[in-house]
């Protein structure tokens, strides 16, 4: 039986102003491509500042893999407008380049075309590059340039006072509450790739040298896909790898989480020992352990704290508390010029509020297996109308469409209880669209993208979309940041990197 919010509707209505006060931030990744649709071989443009110290514009694995970061805000519109402004600045300053609009990469002629991100000569900068060398040697460079959108989310401290009082929780740092949310996200978060997964297909070059037991199909252009997949990015050919399945996170409490992750960071792994640490004075990885560092842990959601001058200890989660959670299961929305639409933010917020309010029992080994199986089914076969998920609490399986309708109906009850008067029409439209996607899986993002990719091919469709998005972005005006502020931030970041390097000599 899926928990419902109906049991605590009176409390929700009494505390709606605290529930509505949530904070968010977005991290959007996107590959720079040349005019022919190849991955860019140019270094990170200097006009964007230093990727090591810039607050909003950085790089992920590759020099060509941009990461755009919005500051924390309690406003959905501000967040989406800030992300939009960053894209305007990027697009206006790319020379003979564009942004690839999909999660799965553009065509990759060979791995040597993927240049690992560089961060200068400071100890911090060198460590970041060595870490990426390790990722390349462990998982392959192609997997590391799969793009995603990370959604950062938190509640105001006033909410936690009300929440802890209601549930009689003694918790100075709100870790118990955040882990209640995280467990329910693991139980039901597969709803995100069902509706918003957008990587059912990839260019054939991605699959060269890839070993998998999955049975794929090809379109007439040679692109490779799974007919009912929602998100190959989240599958075994993406970020869910067999090695990390050894790390069994249940998110039952903060101490257990930190202990498991620390153990993985200290446990040598035979295959990584074979890679070694150095070859001809080139650092191949930070260490030979299951995880080089916490960031290497590929999970659907993470408890997080903000970096303080690029310093962070895993134990800070215990002694200083969780500041926010990072949702990592969002594919890039290829139909949006900025990789995400505001209706997705509305849904994410209400879904995460629902996750904190419904019952959240501890996860045991048996339920963990069911949870992982449910995610796998939705990721690989989610648009199959016959697909069923495991209802762990009832010890039986139920059709995915029935579970989706149950959750959507409960979310609508929650929205009504929170009385979003200004946004009532927005939520009505969102739920109308989501119910349509439930009844007809082909209307999901993955369904629409697969249909167009089969007709036009990934390469042509991606190029056409990137050109269309560029035109859309170029003609917009900045709304929340002015152009000069972006230039100043870039200049400031370069100076900060220089100071960092000088202080180490």
Curated annotation (Swiss-Prot):
The enzyme class is ligase
Q: Which Gene3D superfamilies match?
A: 3.30.590.20
Taken from the UniProt entry, a GO cellular component term is: cytosol
Q: Where is the signal peptide?
A: none
Specify the domain of life of the species encoding this protein. Bacteria
Q: Which InterPro entries match?
A: Gln_synth/guanido_kin_cat_dom, Glu_cys_ligase, Glut_cys_ligase
Gene Ontology BP terms: glutathione biosynthetic process
Per UniProt, what is one GO molecular function of this protein?
A: ATP binding
Question: What Pfam families does the database record attribute to this sequence?
Answer: Glu_cys_ligase (PF04262)
Q: What pathway is it annotated to?
A: Sulfur metabolism; glutathione biosynthesis; glutathione from L-cysteine and L-glutamate: step 1/2
- Keyword Ligase: yes or no? yes
- UniProt keywords, alphabetically: ATP-binding, Glutathione biosynthesis, Ligase, Nucleotide-binding
What is the name attached to this protein's record?
A: Glutamate--cysteine ligase
Q: Upper lineage ranks?
A: Bacteria, Pseudomonadati, Pseudomonadota, Gammaproteobacteria, Enterobacterales
Question: What is the gene called?
Answer: gshA
């Amino acid at each position: 039986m899926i928990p419902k919010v109906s049991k605590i509707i009176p409390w929700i209505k009494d505390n709606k102003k605290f529930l509505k006060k949530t904070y968010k931030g977005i991290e959007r990744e996107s590959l720079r491509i040349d005019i022919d649709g190849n991955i860019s071989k140019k270094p990170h443009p200097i006009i964007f500042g230093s990727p090591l110290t810039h607050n909003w514009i950085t790089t992920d694995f590759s020099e060509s893999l941009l990461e755009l970061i919005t500051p924390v805000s309690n406003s959905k519109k501000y967040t989406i407008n800030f992300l939009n402004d960053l894209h305007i600045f990027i697009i206006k300053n790319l020379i003979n380049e564009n942004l690839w609009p999909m999660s799965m990469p553009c065509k990759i002629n060979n791995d040597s075309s993927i240049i690992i991100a560089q961060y200068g000569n400071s100890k911090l900068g060198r460590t970041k590059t060595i870490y990426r060398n390790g990722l390349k040697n462990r998982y392959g460079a192609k997997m590391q340039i799969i793009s995603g959108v990370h959604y950062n989310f938190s509640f105001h401290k006033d909410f936690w006072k009300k929440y802890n009082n209601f549930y009689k929780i003694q918790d100075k740092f709100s870790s118990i509450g955040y882990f209640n949310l995280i467990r329910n996200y693991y139980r039901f978060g597969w709803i995100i790739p069902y509706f918003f997964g957008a990587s059912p297909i990839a260019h054939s070059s991605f699959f060269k040298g890839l070993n998998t037991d999955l049975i794929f199909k090809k379109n007439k252009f040679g692109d490779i896909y799974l007919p009912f997949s929602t998100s190959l990015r989240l599958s075994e050919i993406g970020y869910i790898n067999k090695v990390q399945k050894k790390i069994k996170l249940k998110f039952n409490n903060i101490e257990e989480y930190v202990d498991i992750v620390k153990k993985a960071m200290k446990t040598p792994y035979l295959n990584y020992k074979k890679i070694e640490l150095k070859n001809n004075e080139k650092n191949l990885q930070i260490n030979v352990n299951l995880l080089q560092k916490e960031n290497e842990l590929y999970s659907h959601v993470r408890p997080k704290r903000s970096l303080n001058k690029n310093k962070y200890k895993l134990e800070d989660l215990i002694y200083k508390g969780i500041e926010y959670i990072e949702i990592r299961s969002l594919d890039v929305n290829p139909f949006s010029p900025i990789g995400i639409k505001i209706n997705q933010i509305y849904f994410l917020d209400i879904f995460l509020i629902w996750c904190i309010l419904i019952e959240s029992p501890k996860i045991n080994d048996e339920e963990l297996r069911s949870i992982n199986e449910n995610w796998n089914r939705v990721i690989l076969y989610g648009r199959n109308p016959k697909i069923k998920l495991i209802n762990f609490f009832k010890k039986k399986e139920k059709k995915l469409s029935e579970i989706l309708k149950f959750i959507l109906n409960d979310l609508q009850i929650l929205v009504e209880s929170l009385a979003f008067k200004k946004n009532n029409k927005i939520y009505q439209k969102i739920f109308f669209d989501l119910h349509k996607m439930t009844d007809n899986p082909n209307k999901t993002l993955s369904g629409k993208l697969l249909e167009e990719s089969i007709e036009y091919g990934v390469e042509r469709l991606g190029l056409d979309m990137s050109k269309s998005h560029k035109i859309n972005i170029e003609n917009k005006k900045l709304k929340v940041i002015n152009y000069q502020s972006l230039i100043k931030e870039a200049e400031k970041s370069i100076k900060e990197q220089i100071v960092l390097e000088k202080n180490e000599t």
